[in-house]
């Protein structure tokens, strides 16, 4: 077996051959079922990463969760398949190719649409598989031989059918609405894809002259964060409850610079406490103004073009960018004596998630999906429990998102993507959505052209669970595998993707797309802040796999998957996981080194230690099944760690050594039991740590149930139930507690392991006394002790230390071994130092000034220090109290 040093230095050297062997055997496709689950399928779909993507920590966490689930299902006998694929990522890919062309000194406008799309396909061929290779490096058992792509011909056909069917059912329509427009990418952007950035800005108070002075006042004052949009103002709004302005409703304003007369009107949207209570209204450049304009029949005037440049008709302002227009218009108001005053004002602005340009609310003609009919059923299947969310709190978040969902803008002004299949006759005005391209009008024979826009990437990805399984062309392929078992994804796309998959699946298949939705935590930096290149706090999973191996990274991440919303990445967990993998490897090495002359056979728990180990193993299987079924992955990792490290490695292996040395049938029985426990435990650990477990499995002797652990059977909790033995658990638990306590006392006082210690035992009753006496020889061997007395009325000797176990108190005699005066002085000195530290940190953390001014991570760090000091003080004071009794 590979040494620990080699394993740490060259994980890929032994991980990749195992992966290649699994792949060559065909284990990554749909595996044949077996056992009681053999007739059932277990299918999951990977959230398709962008074809432009590189593996990041979110992928690493989510792919670990999914692979853990699919590997267990495969071992449970299901016909398991994890569907792999990538998303064409419209705007992301177009941005990448635009950048590549720019480096070559050309633009897409110069080469035209057809050649640009060819360039996108070329880019995908050259770079698009990077993330798939990285997913493979994690050991993910996806179906690599049937990789899907959201722009493949089969998938494109499904997308087209959805558009045509919804169009003909009246669910897709074209409308003139406000959208989030990126002037740099020159396309609409979804609300949920916009990023919000805090900006230190201003609130400009502008004077708008009244057409006819009222009460001697010649102007009204409006407050705005965007003076450049005043060119498109078509009204001034006030609250109908605002007594200051009731008499002005119905009057008009002379819009400065432009000279347009605009009405003063009342609308309940207006907050009379904000600014002056008068709101300039620009229906074409603000969604709230648009809504007020619709309610009050205001004119809609676009003052910017698609590049956010002022359009013609505005004199010297035409041709200016938004920022230039803002500066010039404020200067003009000041020159006219119409700039009342300016205040500092912090607010959030929306930016493009790709290029980070400020988005412009822009009135334009777009294609929309009417969602009211669709979202009703999508809510019902969650409310009635057909789809379950994990953690359960995300159910309400999903329902709230649906309740507030507005019609979905699905058109994008890009070239790379699914082109909208709408066709228009240039002669007679005929138009329709078609499944096949045409250049001739079916009505008049005139020339036909296709819509220039493409569909939102989320429009195509909403079909992912069923379009990847043969729909609509091969419904028989979909039938046995649908709905899929579960979906694991991030919270930020619950609306963008999860809800839309539910809506489209219910419409087109009349079934839910998945039964369970896992919303995994977002991986944050150790300081709790989002990981980002600009902050320099990002973590590269590829580097982590080099340092800790794929298993170390996977298990370390699973240990951190609690029900929390965010996961503060803790690299120490990966260190622990790597050490854990080495512990498992060392335990397996011990077993293998003691298998000379091994004869396979049925395991037989003969001793209390055997019965304890088999019982703990049986309980572990039952417990892991419950944790997996509840998607409690941290519990899975914690219980596996505790069993392997504490029970199997630290105790059962140690308890086995005497019997292995005995020879004969004792040795043979011990060998069979060790192999049985190790083999079963490897199966339980395999989904989380596939490489090291497979490596060890291949080295186990004897005929195997399966050629590879990956397709071996998952332990059956019902079959192992017979091994559960509470009495044996009670006995060995007492043994381990006493031995651990005695060893702790040795370590505390620096007593050599070779020094035999006298122990007096007080039992709580005769049963406990009898139980202890039955294990005296074992305890004495493990702890190097001489038990001088066991009784219910035993007295504690002078100069002794006590360790507690279930049903007994073991008094370890220390006379002649410990200088109690010296030990007491040492403890008092250490306690005094810690008390000073406690006072310092407690005072600091009780100071409101520090709490309000210090960075959150500093406060958190100091709280952790105080908690550690408190814990250490408690332990040292307990030791001092014991010393005082002993001395």
Give the ranges of each region predicted by the language model.
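Active-site neighborhoods of enzyme catalytic cores
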Residues: 1-52, 58-62, 89-98, 117-229, ...
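NTP-handling and nucleic-acid-processing catalytic cores
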Residues: 7-11, 15-20, 137, 141-142, ...
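N-terminal catalytic cores of NTP/NDP-binding nucleotidyl/phosphoryl-transfer enzymes
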Residues: 33-97, 150, 159, 222-225, ...
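Active-site-adjacent bridging/hinge elements
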Residues: 37-46, 68, 104-107, 132-139, ...
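Beta-sheet entry/capping signal
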Residues: 41-43, 77-83, 89-90, 148, ...
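Short Ser/Thr-interspersed hydrophobic loop/turn segments at strand-loop and sheet-helix junctions
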Residues: 44-49, 499-507
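Feature 926 captures the class I aminoacyl-tRNA synthetase adenylation module centered on the KMSKS loop
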Residues: 205, 400-459, 463, 507-550, ...
């Amino acid at each position: 077996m590979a040494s620990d040093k080699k394993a740490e230095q060259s994980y890929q050297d032994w991980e990749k051959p195992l992966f290649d062997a699994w792949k060559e055997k065909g284990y990554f496709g749909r595996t044949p079922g077996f056992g009681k689950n053999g007739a059932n399928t277990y299918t999951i779909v990977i959230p398709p990463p962008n074809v432009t993507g590189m593996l990041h920590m979110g992928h690493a966490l989510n792919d670990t969760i999914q692979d853990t689930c699919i590997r267990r299902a495969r071992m449970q006998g299901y016909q398991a398949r994890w569907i792999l694929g990538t998303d064409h990522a419209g705007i992301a890919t177009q941005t990448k190719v635009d950048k590549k062309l720019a480096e070559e000194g050309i633009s897409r406008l110069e080469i035209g649409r057809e050649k640009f799309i060819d360039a996108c396909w070329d880019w995908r061929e050259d770079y698009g598989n990077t993330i798939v290779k990285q997913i493979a490096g994690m050991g993910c058992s996806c179906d690599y031989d049937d990789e899907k792509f959201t722009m493949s011909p089969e998938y494109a056909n499904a997308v087209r059918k959805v558009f045509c069917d919804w169009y003909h059912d009246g669910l897709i329509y074209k409308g003139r609405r406000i959208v989030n427009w990126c002037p740099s990418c020159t396309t609409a952007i979804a609300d949920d894809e916009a990023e919000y950035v805090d900006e230190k800005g201003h609130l400009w108070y502008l004077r708008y002259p009244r057409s006819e002075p009222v009460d001697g006042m010649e102007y009204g004052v409006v407050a705005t964060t965007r003076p450049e949009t005043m060119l498109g103002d078509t009204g001034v709004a006030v609250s109908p409850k605002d007594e200051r302005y009731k008499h002005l409703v119905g009057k008009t304003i002379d819009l400065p610079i432009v000279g347009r007369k605009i009405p003063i009107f009342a609308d309940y949207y207006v907050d009379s406490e904000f600014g002056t209570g008068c709101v300039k209204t620009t229906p074409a450049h603000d969604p709230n103004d648009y809504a007020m304009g619709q309610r009050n029949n205001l004119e809609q005037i676009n003052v910017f073009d698609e590049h956010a440049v002022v359009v013609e008709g505005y004199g010297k302002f035409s041709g200016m960018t938004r920022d230039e227009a803002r500066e010039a218009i404020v200067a003009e108001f000041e020159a006219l004596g119409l700039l009342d005053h300016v205040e500092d004002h912090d607010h959030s602005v929306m930016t493009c998630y790709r290029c980070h340009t400020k988005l412009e609310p822009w009135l334009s003609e777009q294609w929309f999906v009417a969602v009211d009919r669709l979202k009703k059923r999508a809510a019902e299947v969650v409310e009635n429990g057909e789809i379950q969310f994990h953690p359960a709190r995300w159910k309400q978040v999903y329902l709230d998102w649906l309740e507030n969902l507005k019609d979905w803008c699905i058109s994008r002004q890009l070239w790379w993507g699914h082109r909208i299949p709408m066709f228009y006759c240039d002669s007679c005005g005929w138009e329709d959505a078609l499944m096949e391209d045409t250049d001739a009008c079916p009505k008049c024979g005139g020339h036909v052209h296709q819509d220039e826009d493409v569909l939102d990437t989320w429009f195509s990805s909403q079909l992912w669970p069923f379009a990847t399984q043969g729909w609509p062309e091969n419904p028989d392929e979909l039938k046995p595998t649908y709905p899929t078992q579960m979906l694991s994804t991030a919270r930020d796309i619950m609306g963008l993707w999860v809800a839309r998959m539910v809506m489209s699946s219910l419409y087109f298949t009349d079934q839910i797309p998945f039964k369970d939705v896992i919303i995994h935590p977002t991986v944050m930096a150790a300081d709790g802040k989002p990981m980002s290149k600009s902050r320099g706090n990002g973590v590269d999973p590829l580097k982590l796999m080099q340092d800790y191996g794929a298993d170390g990274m996977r298990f370390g991440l699973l240990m951190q998957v609690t029900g929390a919303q965010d996961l503060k990445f803790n690299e120490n967990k990966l260190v622990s996981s790597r050490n854990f993998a080495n512990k498992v490897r060392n335990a397996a090495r011990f077993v293998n080194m003691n298998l000379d002359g091994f004869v396979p056979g049925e395991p037989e728990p003969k001793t209390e230690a055997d019965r304890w180990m088999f019982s703990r193993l049986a309980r572990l299987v039952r417990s892991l099944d419950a944790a997996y079924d509840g998607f409690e992955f941290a519990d899975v990792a914690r219980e596996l760690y505790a069993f392997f490290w504490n029970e199997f490695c630290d105790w059962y292996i140690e308890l086995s050594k005497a019997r292995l040395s005995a020879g004969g049938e004792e040795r043979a029985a011990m060998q069979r039991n060790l192999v049985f426990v190790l083999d079963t435990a490897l199966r339980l650990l395999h989904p989380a740590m596939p490489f090291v477990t497979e490596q060890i499995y291949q080295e186990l002797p004897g005929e195997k149930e399966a050629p590879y652990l990956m397709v071996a059977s998952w332990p059956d909790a019902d079959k192992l139930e017979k091994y559960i033995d509470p009495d044996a658990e009670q006995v060995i638990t007492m043994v381990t507690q006493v031995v651990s306590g005695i060893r702790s006392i040795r370590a505390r006082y620096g007593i050599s392991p070779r020094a035999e210690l006298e122990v007096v035992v007080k039992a709580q009753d005769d049963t406990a006394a009898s139980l202890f006496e039955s294990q005296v020889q074992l305890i004495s061997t493990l702890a190097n002790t001489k038990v001088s007395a066991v009784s219910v009325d035993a007295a504690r000797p002078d100069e002794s230390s006590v360790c507690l176990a279930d049903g007994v108190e073991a008094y370890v005699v220390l006379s002649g071994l410990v200088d109690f005066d010296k030990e007491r002085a040492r403890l008092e000195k250490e306690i005094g130092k810690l008390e000073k530290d406690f006072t310092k940190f407690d005072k600091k953390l009780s100071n409101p000034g520090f709490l309000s001014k210090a960075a959150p991570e500093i406060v958190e760090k100091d709280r952790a220090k105080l908690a550690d000091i408190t814990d250490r003080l408690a332990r040292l004071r307990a030791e001092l109290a014991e010393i005082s009794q002993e001395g």
